[in-house]
From Swiss-Prot:
Induction: Produces at least 2 transcripts by alternative transcriptional initiation encoding identical proteins; one of these transcripts (EF1gamma-RA) is induced by ecdysone signaling during pupation. Residues 223-261 are annotated as: Disordered. GO terms for biological process: regulation of organelle transport along microtubule; translational elongation. Signal peptide: none annotated. It is found in: Cytoplasm; Nucleus; Cytoplasm, Cytoskeleton. It comes from Drosophila melanogaster. This is Elongation factor 1-gamma. Residues 237-254 have a biased composition (Basic and acidic residues). Interacts with microtubules. May interact with BicDR; the interaction is probably indirect. Interacts (via C-terminus) with Doa; the interaction is probably direct, is transient and leads to phosphorylation of eEF1gamma by Doa. EF-1 is composed of four subunits: alpha, beta, delta, and gamma. InterPro entries: EF-GSTs (IPR050802), EF1B_G_C (IPR001662), EF1B_G_C_sf (IPR036433), Glutathione-S-Trfase_C-like (IPR010987), Glutathione-S-Trfase_C_sf (IPR036282), Glutathione_S-Trfase (IPR040079), Glutathione_S-Trfase_N (IPR004045), GST_C (IPR004046). The lineage of its organism: Eukaryota, Metazoa, Ecdysozoa, Arthropoda, Hexapoda. Keywords: Cytoplasm, Cytoskeleton, Elongation factor, Nucleus, Phosphoprotein, Protein biosynthesis. Phosphorylated on Ser-294 by LAMMER kinases, including Doa. Phosphorylation on Ser-294 by Doa is required for negative regulation of microtubule-based transport.
Length: 431
């Protein structure tokens, strides 16, 4: 098992590749303490190990040194992430890694960095169109595929996902990303993997795209010392010509580091709050109910639910899948439910659901009972939660009616039939 130290600054998307790979493989990676970009990586000690001064950089426990984020991720990965035993899948992994570096990252930087004040805004820029063209390629690929290479998550998914983080955080607002539904589902699925959640924390999808702000650009340039080209030119004229020649190439050799500094600036952006925080908490305690439901028989847990339920601040909803006629294999239908749960992971704190599959292969339906804080559809509170809900018909139920109590009892106890008489097959709990 690989052990070592990773040199990087917080929330560097390039370092995420390696850290996520390590979560899958079990590699023991320590992130270097007190790393400061622009100082640590320019020190004589660091440059002796990594002459390029680039980050992320990795030092193994045996004293071996490796740079370039994709190479580090490969070292820390396991066989599955590298493509398994199939040479073609291995080649596909490399294909998508190259695609990320050559197509996604340049388009993302050209679109996002000017909006963050890192680069000047270019007139007649085609960055947005180029990024959307890249996303369209991905969308087509993912139309009939769950993952980018093979049937399981690989470095292809990890690297492409990491390269898309800035786009999904800063510019792909709902109206824009709606054109890339396949990519959206894949992106949120990867985001909600526990190995990814351990690395990419408190991430929120873009709600409103950034716009260029000249003031922000001026402030960033002043902070990094790059906003005074005229003053630098005047100083160079006053200095001796030999010195002027020495400094000219130095500035041209630093663009890669400027992009790393940009990532550092991105990490300082404020994170959004839990969408449920704006709603009254009421008296219903989801944690207590979930504990009772998990540990007690339905004969106790269901009466407990109705006894404690706060109808003033919480609501009960019935959700029915719109395209039941398209369902085929039972296991595939169950994957639809599980995938939705994964994409709604951050909603669990103030929600509960029992979603059931009725019927059999080629003749089945999906429907469920959902409970959450608030009186309106919870999915509209956050773009993160809007991937799947539109493929369901939603009906708000009267918590005090006997009909609702019977329906809740049926779904919470996994029993009965659907409205057309199909027998209960299996269920999934969102808690």
């Amino acid at each position: 098992m690989v052990k070592g130290t990773l040199y990087t600054y917080p929330e560097n998307f390039r370092a995420y590749k390696a850290l996520i790979a390590a979560q899958y493989s079990g590699a023991q990676v320590k992130v270097a303490d007190n790393f400061k970009f622009g100082e640590t990586n320019k020190s004589a000690e660091f440059l002796k190990k990594f002459p390029g001064g680039k980050v992320p950089a990795f030092e193994t426990a045996e004293g071996q040194y490796l740079s370039e984020s994709n190479a580090i991720a490969y070292l820390l990965a396991n066989e599955q992430l590298r493509g398994g035993k199939c040479p073609f899948v291995q080649a596909q992994v490399q294909q998508w890694i190259s695609f990320a570096d050559n197509e996604i990252v340049p388009a993302s930087c050209a679109w996002v960095f000017p909006l963050l004040g890192i680069l000047p805004q270019q007139k007649n820029s085609t960055a947005k169109q180029e990024a959307e063209a890249v996303l369209q390629q991905l969308n087509q690929k993912l139309q009939d595929a769950t993952f980018l290479a093979g049937e399981r998550i690989t470095l292809a998914d990890i690297v492409v996902f990491s390269s898309l983080l800035h786009l999904y955080e800063y510019v792909l607002e709902p109206s824009v990303r709606s054109a890339f539904g396949n990519v959206n589902r894949w992106f949120v699925t990867i985001l909600n993997q526990k190995q990814v959640q351990a690395v990419v924390k408190d991430y929120k999808l873009c709600e409103k795209a950034l716009v260029f702000d000249p003031k922000k650009y001026a402030e960033f340039q002043a902070k990094t010392g790059a906003a005074k080209p005229q003053q630098q030119a005047q100083q160079q004229k006053q200095e001796k010509k030999p010195k002027e020649k020495k400094e000219a190439p130095k500035k041209a050799a630093e663009p890669a580091e400027e992009l790393d500094a940009a990532d550092e600036a991105l990490a300082a952006e404020p994170k959004s709050k839990d969408p449920f925080d704006a709603l009254p908490k009421g008296t219903f305690n989801f944690d207590d109910f979930k504990r009772v439901y998990s540990n007690e028989d339905e004969a106790k847990s269901i009466p407990y639910f109705f006894d404690k339920f706060d109808a003033e601040n919480y609501s009960i909803w019935f959700g029915e899948y719109k395209y039941n006629e398209e369902l085929s294999k039972v296991f595939m239908s169950c994957n639809l439910i599980t995938g939705m749960f994964q994409r709604l992971d951050k909603m669990r704190k103030a929600a509960f659901a029992s979603v059931c599959l009725f019927g059999e292969d080629g003749n089945s339906t999906i429907s469920g009972i959902w409970v959450w804080r608030g009186q309106d559809l919870a999915f509209t509170l956050s773009p993160d939660w809007q991937i799947d809900y539109e493929v369901y018909d939603w009906k708000k139920l009267d918590a005090k009616s006997e009909e609702t109590k019977k329906l809740v009892t049926q779904y919470f106890s996994w029993s009965g039939t659907d409205k057309d008489g199909r027998k209960f097959n299996q269920g999934k709990i969102f808690k």
